[in-house]
């Protein structure tokens, strides 16, 4: 086993990377509230794992979506647990994101030179809210359907571009299969990809600049 490790160590300098990760200075003022961002990341990873598991059984059609969710909850081994963890983790992710934003704002973590870190964090907060909106509709039950209808109807109040924007969101003049397909694509591909990219940028900047000092 040591020979295998030595082979990788010689080429990748694994120990140097590990030392760099574990030896980062942590300011003495840091407390449990500085862990909220890490908890949000953990929730996101749980979301990815449980969401991926459900894609094997979920069917994104207006005629089969609700039945497929029922199938996951009643027939799939531990399906009820996977979906429940997904829902609980989603709620936790939203809560942790809100608390994290407030913590950073109240402690002045958005000030120079961390403006870009703050901007990426705000983008991540918007993406988190978008996860909630798109995921809420996927069971395609009464609550999900009417939530989508209301949310996608909001832009209609915008002058000139309101109606085209509503049609772009819905995929047609009314809420239906095109809307569900769009929301499913956003929830399972577009939003996770964007979130992963912005999280990487966010963490690299934190890694480079370190944790902000006390007020």
UniProtKB/Swiss-Prot annotation:
GO molecular function: electron transporter, transferring electrons within cytochrome b6/f complex of photosystem II activity; metal ion binding; oxidoreductase activity
UniProtKB keywords: Chloroplast, Electron transport, Heme, Iron, Membrane, Metal-binding, Photosynthesis, Plastid, Thylakoid, Transmembrane, Transmembrane helix, Transport
Binding site for heme c: 35
Residues that hold heme b 1 according to the record: 100, 202
A cellular-component GO term for this protein: chloroplast thylakoid membrane
Binding residues annotated for heme b 2, in chain numbering: 86, 187
Signal peptide range in chain numbering: none
Pfam families per UniProt: Cytochrome_B (PF00033)
Entry-linked Gene3D superfamilies: Cytochrome Bc1 Complex, Chain C (1.20.810.10)
Transmembrane segments: 32-52, 90-110, 116-136, 186-206
Any one GO biological process: photosynthesis
Cofactor or coenzyme needed: heme b; heme c
Role of this protein: Component of the cytochrome b6-f complex, which mediates electron transfer between photosystem II (PSII) and photosystem I (PSI), cyclic electron flow around PSI, and state transitions.
Self-association and partners: The 4 large subunits of the cytochrome b6-f complex are cytochrome b6, subunit IV (17 kDa polypeptide, PetD), cytochrome f and the Rieske protein, while the 4 small subunits are PetG, PetL, PetM and PetN. The complex functions as a dimer.
Family the entry assigns: Belongs to the cytochrome b family. PetB subfamily.
Protein name: Cytochrome b6
Gene giving rise to this polypeptide: petB
